[in-house]
């Protein structure tokens, strides 16, 4: 136990409001395209992201690396990706280290959530979006190492040879 003569109150967020961000990170330019909502991420959210990517990169080849979430592998998403000429590549299961957007989410949590208090939900949302939108300008040096494209390639593995 720790005793003190004066009480110290720590502010914390009240309520259970939800703010979801679904994003795609350009590995070369560090540009982020996001879709946000206040409900749940589902196949329609992924379709919105595909439309946003297609609109932003008209006439360009777009390859999107995804994890194996069920809503990202459904027929609706795959059909739309084919229609928009977006190549979908699914990463191996349980490999968030290969997904660069997971590194961005970790960075956002560290910058926005750790030891921070927001007295209103809109301020919380703004802080998250400002951090995400700052990936091209703020903290470029620390983000350069965070988004490194140096992945270990394993040529021969006992697991792959069995």
Placement of each model-derived feature along the sequence:
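Short functional hotspots at interaction and active-site rims
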Residues: 1-162
């Amino acid at each position: 136990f720790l005793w003190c003569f004066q009480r110290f109150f720590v502010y914390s967020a009240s309520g259970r409001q939800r703010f979801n961000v679904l994003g795609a990170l350009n590995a070369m330019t560090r540009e982020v395209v996001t879709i946000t909502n206040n409900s749940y991420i589902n196949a329609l959210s992924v379709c919105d992201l595909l439309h946003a990517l297609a609109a932003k990169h008209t006439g360009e080849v777009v390859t999107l690396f995804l994890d194996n979430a069920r809503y990202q592998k459904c027929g609706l998403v795959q059909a739309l990706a084919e229609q928009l000429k977006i190549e979908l590549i699914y990463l191996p299961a349980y490999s968030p280290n290969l997904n660069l957007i997971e590194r961005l989410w970790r960075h956002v949590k560290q910058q926005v959530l750790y030891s921070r208090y927001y007295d209103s939900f809109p301020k919380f949302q703004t802080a998250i979006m400002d951090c995400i939108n700052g990936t091209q300008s703020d903290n470029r040096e620390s983000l350069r190492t965070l988004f490194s494209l140096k992945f270990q390639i394993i040529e021969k593995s006992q697991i792959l040879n069995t």
